[in-house]
Amino acid sequence: MSMNTLELKSAYEAAYHKSATAIYFAPGRVNLIGEHTDYNGGFVFPCALSFGTYLLVAPNDEQKINFRSLNVEAVYSLELTQLTTPLPDKAWANYPIGVFAQFMKRGVAITQGYDILFWGMCLQALD
């Protein structure tokens, strides 16, 4: 499945009944040399790919963060006070929840709820 940003905006509006206030794109990457050495201080020769993951977001009036993905059916909604507790069963939302948890660990106050929609073109790992 391929989508453009207009289709992603429409999908966000269908899911949350409002417009996204920001859209982000994180390109996938491959390492031509140096696989798994970059996070250990080693050298790598990566290149960005034209496919990756999109994130659409807007603040909400609730004290919770809502996570949806167009790639999987599971939808998650967490109170702001739950953002440091991982979800059970290897839930996909644990990845973005972990980002929020690390911000909080570093003293960033998460005081606003958000409605978040993900869509990615990268292959998903299987267990």
Predicted features, each with a name:
Residues 2-127:
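ATP-binding N-lobe of GHMP and related small-molecule kinases
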